[in-house]
Design a protein with these regions (language model features):
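Membrane-embedded transmembrane helical bundles of large multi-pass transporters/channels
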Residues: 1-56, 157-342
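Solvent-exposed, non-transmembrane loop/terminal regulatory segments of multi-pass membrane proteins
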Residues: 51-90, 126-142, 152-153, 157-161
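Extracytoplasmic
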Residues: 67, 71-72, 97-152, 187-191
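Short, solvent-exposed beta-strand edge segments and adjacent coil->beta transition regions
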Residues: 84-88, 146-148, 254-256
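Soluble periplasmic/extracytoplasmic beta-strand elements of cell-envelope proteins
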Residues: 88-90, 148-152, 178, 266-268
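Conserved short loop/turn motifs at secondary-structure junctions
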Residues: 90-96, 284
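Active-site-proximal beta-strand/loop segments in catalytic clefts of secreted hydrolases
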Residues: 91-92, 118, 152-154, 182-183
Length: 342
């Protein structure tokens, strides 16, 4: 019984000590708030630099385990045969001589290893009709008056060089030409993602402002929330430069997910501040110091659980989970720090 009371006393004493440390930390943040704000804005510069220098990987297949037969085959194609990606170009309603000229232009594009069409096998002076039906049907479709051209690259499917080559080929070809294949799809995904991500992030921000303005007693406070969370998002995305690259899925989801996951922390801080204003009337600094202390105490446990959930993704054999898990775990940590400091 004595040991039980001793344990209870020590536990209570330890909690009081931790509470005092948190209040001391909160007072330090309030006291140096201007300096912290200046440093926070200054850190946006290297964060922005890191963001723009982080490569985005648009090849979802590269996150598959290396021991899969398909991945081994891809490596063999590149290493032993010097052929990585390939695309197919469907050409409609174009004269053979113009198609031949187009093939030569495409062959001159950087990182195009070869372009295979009829004139790769025979001279154009030889009519296609003399070809066996099996070979003729590979290149032509009489019903749609179209022909097929195969383009082989010396780089992998989602390499930056391959995507640049795809863009250049599209600049050479006309509206009569349709480029297909995984490399073309990856290039389209890149263009689509880059165009739409800012749009739906803006929608998320506007909806957050609208909801918070309707549910809170101030229309300005939501803007400060978003400023703090926005800076945390920039820090998180900028720190990805350490990883070297992130997937386009992670890039597309990270900002909106971090906004949704960490918004609660700022709301809790605001409500705690209002409660402490009633406790310490007329002393806003003291009220905020205690609000920061209360927020840290309550939010740390919740944030650790959230981080643990994202870390669990890192154990997937499909390493897209690792990519997304690490970025989002960092995002939660940056969100907590920004909430109680900025």
């Amino acid at each position: 019984m004595q040991s039980f009371f001793l344990y209870s006393y020590l536990e209570k004493h330890e909690k009081e000590r931790d509470g005092k440390e948190m209040i001391k930390f909160g007072k330090g943040v309030v006291k140096h708030r201007v300096l912290i704000l200046i440093i926070s804005f200054a850190l946006l510069i290297p964060a922005a630099f890191g963001y723009f220098n982080t490569r985005v990987n648009y090849d979802i297949l590269s996150y598959l385990p290396g021991e899969l037969e398909s991945m081994k085959g891809q490596d063999i194609l590149v290493d032993e045969f010097g052929t990585g990606a390939f695309s197919l170009c469907v050409i409609e309603g174009m004269e053979d001589k113009d198609i031949s000229t187009l093939r030569e232009q495409i062959a001159d594009v950087d990182h195009v290893k070869s372009v295979v069409w009829y004139d790769s096998l025979a001279d154009l002076s030889v009519p296609m009709d003399v070809l066996p039906d099996e070979i003729y049907d590979i290149f032509n479709n009489d019903e749609s008056d179209s022909t097929l051209m195969a383009i082989l690259f010396d780089t992998s499917m989602s390499a930056d060089e391959t995507m640049d080559a795809i863009e250049e080929i599209r600049g050479i070809t006309t509206k009569q030409c349709y480029l297909s294949g995984m490399s073309a799809v990856v290039t389209d995904i890149k263009d689509l993602t880059n165009k739409e991500v800012p749009f739906y992030v803006l929608i998320a921000v506007l909806l957050s402002v609208l909801v918070l303005s309707l549910t809170m007693d101030s229309a300005i406070i939501p803007l400060f929330f978003l400023l703090s969370i926005g800076m945390a998002i920039v820090y998180n995305l900028g720190s990805n430069v350490i990883k070297g690259e992130i997937s386009y899925v992670t890039q597309a989801l990270a900002a909106v997910l971090q906004l949704g996951v960490t918004m609660d922390y700022s709301i809790f801080l605001w409500h705690s501040y209002q409660e402490n204003q009633e406790r310490f009337p007329g002393d806003k600094n003291r009220a905020m110091a205690h609000a920061i202390s209360n927020t840290i105490t309550s939010v740390v446990g919740s944030s650790i659980t959230t981080v643990a959930g994202f870390i669990a993704l890192c154990f997937m054999s499909f390493t897209l989970g690792l990519d997304l898990g690490v970025v989002m775990a960092k995002g939660v940590i940056f969100g907590v720090i920004a909430c109680v400091t900025i």
